[in-house]
Amino acid sequence: MAPSALLRPFWKLLAPARFPSVSSSRSKFYIQEPPHGSPNWLKVGLTLGTSVFLWIYLIKQHNEDVLEYKRRNGLE
């Protein structure tokens, strides 16, 4: 086999990348624009509720860890 035939696939790796046009790539992923006038209140509520729950749990766990640290090291 000729050396040029072996190197031919590697030249494709060295070629500059070609990006698809913006309009063709958008049409693949966005069928329609989401409605911005009416937010999905269920998702908003679940997101905020989860965030509040996690912060409360984090603070509670931190306080328990601080008390355990003080107890083990005789600082209390």
Swiss-Prot record:
According to the record, the signal peptide region is none
InterPro entries referenced in this protein's UniProt entry, alphabetically: NDUFC1
This entry carries the following GO cellular component terms, namely: mitochondrial inner membrane; mitochondrion; respiratory chain complex I
Q: Give compartment(s).
A: Mitochondrion inner membrane
Transit peptide per record:
1-27
The way this protein sits in the membrane is described as: Single-pass membrane protein
What are the record keywords, sorted? Answer: Electron transport, Membrane, Mitochondrion, Mitochondrion inner membrane, Respiratory chain, Transit peptide, Transmembrane, Transmembrane helix, Transport
Could you list the residue ranges that cross the membrane?
A: 41-59
Disulfide links within the chain: none
Instruction: Tell me if NADP is a UniProt keyword of this record.
Output: no
Q: What is its main location?
A: mitochondrion
Q: Name one Pfam family in it.
A: NADH_dh_m_C1
Q: Which family does it belong to?
A: Belongs to the complex I NDUFC1 subunit family.
Sum up the protein's function in the record's words: Accessory subunit of the mitochondrial membrane respiratory chain NADH dehydrogenase (Complex I), that is believed not to be involved in catalysis. Complex I functions in the transfer of electrons from NADH to the respiratory chain. The immediate electron acceptor for the enzyme is believed to be ubiquinone.
**Quaternary structure and interacting proteins, as annotated:** Complex I is composed of 45 different subunits.
Instruction: Please state what the protein is called.
Output: NADH dehydrogenase [ubiquinone] 1 subunit C1, mitochondrial
